Every structure is written in C-alpha cells, then in structure tokens.
Amino acid sequence: MALERTFSIIKPDAVKRNLIGEIYHRIEKAGLQIIAAKMVHLSEEQASGFYAEHEGKPFFEPLKEFMTSGPIMVQVLEGENAIARYRELMGKTNPEEAACGTLRADYALSMRYNSVHGSDSPASAAREIEFFFPESEICPRP
C-alpha cells in the first residue's frame, strides 16, 4: 500500500494544557511520521476560511471563537493508511463515545473542546494541508 498524507490539528485546549509532546509521541508510536509542523494563532479570517464548509451551521461561530482562542499546532502526517490510522488514534468526536486509549478519550474536555482534528478523506487532507503548508515546507522522511 502506498504512503498517504493526512492533516492534523492540536487544538487550543490541548496546547494550553501542554499536551503537544504527549500527542506527538502517540502519533509517532502509531507509525505515522510528522513531516511538517508549526504553531499558529488563527485569525478570525483564517478560521472562517478553513471552516468555510460549516458556514451557516449553528456551531460555526462557537467553533471559530474556540479555534481563535489560542495557538494551535498544525501538522502533516504521513504513513500507510494515514487518514484511517490517525482517525482511529483520535477516537470519536464525542469523547464520551471514544474508545479507551484514544486521544479524545484521554485528553478531550468535551465534544467542543476535543483536543484534536484530523482529515476525514483524501480530498479534505489535500485541501487542509494546502491551506497551511506550501509544498516547500513539507519534508518527507526516509
């Protein structure tokens, strides 16, 4: 099977609680490589652009408010079946339904403050990666 890329966010709630290192450790332990990463503080305009598909939905404004409330870590992950593998590691969106040992079961505070985001399809991964990273900032590892 070919290598696949996915996009990941460590959200403001997890950054604030100093969970970046623990989450990175678990990503790498799951067999995924971090091939690009940076810390950013989203502007309202950036958050609106990134979450444009949700505009008009009841959770859009609270989501933007949360995602602009503090710095986030954005990263590109690479590995076999990276999208499915990272989604399995994250667990269900609602931490109460997430399996034990998943990132959300272990670190999420609530459904809104659920610590991490991951792309749900190859098309989403490509769009989300391109939103934050020019190809020159992505460094595949052997």
UniProtKB/Swiss-Prot annotation:
It catalyses: dZDP + ATP = dZTP + ADP; a 2'-deoxyribonucleoside 5'-diphosphate + ATP = a 2'-deoxyribonucleoside 5'-triphosphate + ADP; a ribonucleoside 5'-diphosphate + ATP = a ribonucleoside 5'-triphosphate + ADP. The keyword Lipid biosynthesis does not apply. Pathway: Purine metabolism. GO terms for molecular function: ATP binding; metal ion binding; nucleoside diphosphate kinase activity. It is an enzyme of class 2 (transferase). The active site is at residue 117. Its EC number is 2.7.4.6. Keywords: ATP-binding, Cytoplasm, Kinase, Magnesium, Metal-binding, Nucleotide metabolism, Nucleotide-binding, Phosphoprotein, Transferase. One of its GO terms (cellular component) is cytoplasm. CDD domains: NDPk_I. ATP binds at residues 11, 59, 87, 93, 104, 114. It comes from the Bacteria. It is found in: Cytoplasm. GO terms for biological process: CTP biosynthetic process; GTP biosynthetic process; UTP biosynthetic process. InterPro entries: NDK-like_dom, NDK-like_dom_sf, Nucleoside_diP_kinase, Nucleoside_diP_kinase_AS. Its main location: cytoplasm. Homotetramer. Major role in the synthesis of nucleoside triphosphates other than ATP. The ATP gamma phosphate is transferred to the NDP beta phosphate via a ping-pong mechanism, using a phosphorylated active-site intermediate. Belongs to the NDK family. NCBIfam families: PRK00668.1 (NF001908). This is Nucleoside diphosphate kinase. It comes from Vibrio cholerae serotype O1 (strain M66-2).
